[in-house]
Curated annotation (Swiss-Prot):
Subunit structure: Homohexamer. Dimer of trimers.
Its biological purpose: Catalyzes the first intracellular reaction of sulfate assimilation, forming adenosine-5'-phosphosulfate (APS) from inorganic sulfate and ATP. Plays an important role in sulfate activation as a component of the biosynthesis pathway of sulfur-containing amino acids.
Upper classification of the organism: Eukaryota, Fungi, Dikarya, Ascomycota, Pezizomycotina
Name of the protein: Sulfate adenylyltransferase
GO biological process: cysteine biosynthetic process; hydrogen sulfide biosynthetic process; methionine biosynthetic process; sulfate assimilation via adenylyl sulfate reduction; sulfate assimilation, phosphoadenylyl sulfate reduction by phosphoadenylyl-sulfate reductase (thioredoxin)
Reaction(s) catalysed (UniProt annotation): sulfate + ATP + H(+) = adenosine 5'-phosphosulfate + diphosphate
Domain description: The adenylyl-sulfate kinase (APS kinase) is non-functional. It is involved in allosteric regulation by PAPS. PAPS binding induces a large rotational rearrangement of domains lowering the substrate affinity of the enzyme.
Marked site positions, Induces change in substrate recognition on ATP binding: 330
Primary location recorded for the protein, binned into one broad class: cytoplasm
Residues reported in the UniProt entry to bind 3'-phosphoadenylyl sulfate: 434-437, 451, 477-478, 516
Keyword terms: Allosteric enzyme, Amino-acid biosynthesis, ATP-binding, Cysteine biosynthesis, Cytoplasm, Methionine biosynthesis, Nucleotide-binding, Nucleotidyltransferase, Transferase
């Protein structure tokens, strides 16, 4: 028999509300609607299927405050992560939302009605407090960046009534709800289940540690990877799932099953580990593997970890009695070539030879085509990863040129386009500032917000082209650091390559050589909000290359960029 759900009752709202489906669907058509974002869809799916039990909706202010402050809901149940529905004031005003209102929650992908929410309250969160209490307060933390830059200013709390499941078109048979997974465990006769959370491909070491955990507890293994929102730059879930499927036959027959979790991760370290344990308990697991730096976002710009390596393990251990799921501490294993086996590092005698391959080295081997030994990963897994990891020489990239108007960006961009076309091997796209303004952003002005929007449109196009293998040369002014960083994230989040080139031609030179007289007009006040005159240009702090047309020729600058790309492996060296 599987583990009881968190809070004692599985809140399967889809099953609960199924008898009222037609009635709710009809009502939903008459109500104002909130179109959910991708992260909100992930959250709603796990609310409706019971993955977030005991939640029955998005948190009201009382629950939200308690979770932030005390790691538990207002009713006393342990819960570590705020699950909130953020909306703008414009949405609230347009739909005249208030406490007691009912509102339809709609899927942005297909416009389907998913649920009706009855509003308990509408409140403005203290984002700084949430950031500090939940994630630690470091402004470089991706969850805090998301909170400050993307999350809207108001939260709406209230219970939901489920109408429709989210439509998925990939790996449908592996997307078990908690109720379905519990039935599956019962059918298999499993009573002890070790759940393994991952957002990365699995290799021999992962197989070894999960088998060891199961063997020590006379249990079976649930491989439960996240296929919702993970960390930008992660390998896409399509590739990962194919790799998990290839790995599964390497387990003893009947030991392991694969199920997919459509979770939007926050990379919240200790808080997230508790949350993950609750989710796995709701899916019927009795044990949960918590690794070193579990759900941590990596390092900040200073090279420092956001959390201690064992903070997550300590957090889950602190609440193990309330959680009702046994914590299995992730043991780092290493390969012993002399005996052809994996062992936990703390069990390896001094002087015994060991071998390891870091994540960075693995990515480099995939990128360059270097061999990956069978002691590290299985050939069938490596084959799948290689199919999805094109060599650098065939990958796309974005060269993002930023600088004052008339700094030479456009001349460099055009010359670079010709050079890359001559090089061959990939299509080349040019996104000049004036062209994009005319074709994509003609309705935008030059306020800070409009400039940011314009740069994000450029980044979206650049990201799509880059992921398709093209060379993209973008040359907006892009005066703000925030906008440039967001552009970088937009290109790299799907695995794209991004290079920031600061065309640092001095303002005086740009003005002196301005044959169109635009700077003169700005100085006379005929043009407002002009970068370098009455609007600032924020010097990039993270440029890959800094060039200056007042001291260099366009030809030499293009050569510098080509050399940078060659050094990074973007041209075939065969």
């Amino acid at each position: 028999m599987s583990n009881p759900p968190h809070g004692g009752v599985l809140k399967d709202l889809l099953a609960r509300d199924a008898p009222r489906h037609d009635q709710l669907e009809t009502e939903a058509e008459q109500l104002p609607a909130i179109v959910l974002t991708e992260r909100q869809l992930c959250d709603l799916e796990l609310i409706m299927n019971g993955g977030f039990s005991p939640l029955e909706g998005f948190m009201n202010q009382k629950d939200y405050d308690n979770v932030c402050e005390n790691v538990r809901l207002a009713d006393g149940n342990l819960f570590s992560m705020p699950i909130t529905l953020d909306v703008s004031k414009a949405v609230i005003d347009e739909s005249q939302l208030k406490a007691g209102s009912r509102v339809t929650l709609r899927d942005f992908r297909d416009d389907r009605n998913l649920a009706i929410l009855t509003i308990d309250d509408i409140y403005r969160p203290d984002k700084a407090r949430e950031a500090k209490l939940v994630f630690g307060g470091d402004k470089e933390h991706p969850a805090i960046k998301f909170l400050n830059n993307t999350v809207q200013e108001f939260y709406i709390g209230g219970k939901v009534e489920a109408i429709n499941k989210l439509n998925h078109y990939d790996y449908v048979a592996l997307r078990y709800t908690p109720a379905e997974l519990r039935v599956h465990f019962d059918k298999l006769g499993w009573s002890r289940v070790v759940a393994f959370q991952t957002r990365n491909p699995m290799h021999r070491a992962h197989r070894e540690l999960t088998v060891r955990a199961a063997r020590a507890r006379q249990a079976n293994v649930l491989i439960h990877p996240v296929v919702g929102l993970t960390k930008p730059g992660d390998i896409d879930h399509f590739t990962r799932v194919r790799a998990y499927q290839a790995l599964l036959p390497r387990y003893p027959n009947g030991m392991a099953v694969l199920g997919l979790l459509g979770l939007a991760m926050r990379m919240g370290g200790p808080r997230e580990a508790i949350w993950h344990a609750i989710i796995r308990k709701n899916h019927g697991a009795t044990h949960f593997i918590v690794g070193r730096d579990h759900a941590g976002p990596g390092k900040n710009s200073k090279g420092e970890e956001f959390y201690g390596p064992y903070d997550a393990q300590h957090a889950v251990e602190k609440y193990r009695e309330e959680l009702g799921i046994e914590v299995v501490e992730f043991q780092q294993v290493t390969y012993l070539p002399d005996t052809d086996e994996y062992k936990p590092k703390d069990e390896v005698p001094a002087g015994v030879k060991t071998l390891d391959i870091s994540g960075t080295e693995l990515r480099n081997r995939l990128r360059t085509g270097a061999p990956i030994p069978e002691w590290f990963s299985y050939p069938e897994v490596v084959k799948i990863l290689r199919e999805s990891s094109r060599p650098r020489s065939t990958q796309g990239f974005t060269i993002f040129l930023t600088g004052y108007m008339n700094s030479g960006k456009d001349a460099i961009a055009r010359a670079l386009q010709v050079t890359l076309n001559q090089q061959g091997g990939r299509s080349v796209s040019l996104l000049l500032g004036d062209t994009v303004r005319h074709e994509l952003s003609s309705e935008l002005g030059f306020s800070r917000e409009d400039r940011h929007t314009n740069v994000q449109r450029i980044a979206f196009v650049a990201g799509e082209l880059t992921r398709a293998g093209a060379a993209v040369i973008a040359a907006p002014i892009a005066p703000y650091e925030e906008s440039r960083n967001a552009a970088r994230d937009a290109v790299t989040q799907g695995g794209g390559n991004f290079f920031l080139v600061h065309v640092a031609t001095p303002l005086e030179y740009c003005e002196k050589t301005d044959k169109r007289g635009i700077y003169a007009k700005a100085r006379r006040g005929e043009i407002k909000g002009f970068t370098g005159v009455d609007d600032p240009y924020e010097t990039p702090s993270n440029a890959h290359l800094t060039v200056d047309v007042s001291k260099q020729t366009v030809r030499s600058i293009v050569h510098e960029i080509i050399l940078m790309l060659e050094t990074e492996g973007f041209f075939d060296r065969a």
